[in-house]
Amino acid sequence: MKKVLLSVCLFAMTGAAQAADIVRHSNGTNFPIARVVEVPAGKTIYFHSGMTPAPADPKATPGTPEYWGDTKTQALSTFARIKESLDTMKLDFGNVAAMTVYLVGDPAKGGRMDFDGMMAAYSQFFGTKEQPNLPARSTVQVAGLVGPGMLVEIEVQLAK
């Protein structure tokens, strides 16, 4: 009986340790980002380098909109590449605590960043029924990225 009681107590303590997990504080709106993400002591923090998209059409002329695609296409590709990278480390989008999205102004949008296109891609990976965890996130427009015609680079920080 003592062994059973000890096992139950140890199991309960394990559950309590699991409860001391990452806390995501809502921003108080329906917008799918966290206001603050709190990472308790004892968690491992990962700083992932920025990722850019793969060419949408490698047969097109490099640097053209056809080669890279629009902002939504590039963001989808970038998120897919991040997912592949995270998979190799046994991490996933649920571990993302913070994100910075760099968008180049789209010539087809008068030089303004296509925030809606990026959000259409982002919303497929974050705040879904399958993956409800939301990161703290900033999105900024930049003058350019490393590859001519690239419109998207995304950097994530994770905790597990």
Where are these regions (language model features)?
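N-terminal presequence-like segments and the immediate start of the first folded domain
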Residues: 3-9, 13-80, 84-97, 106-160
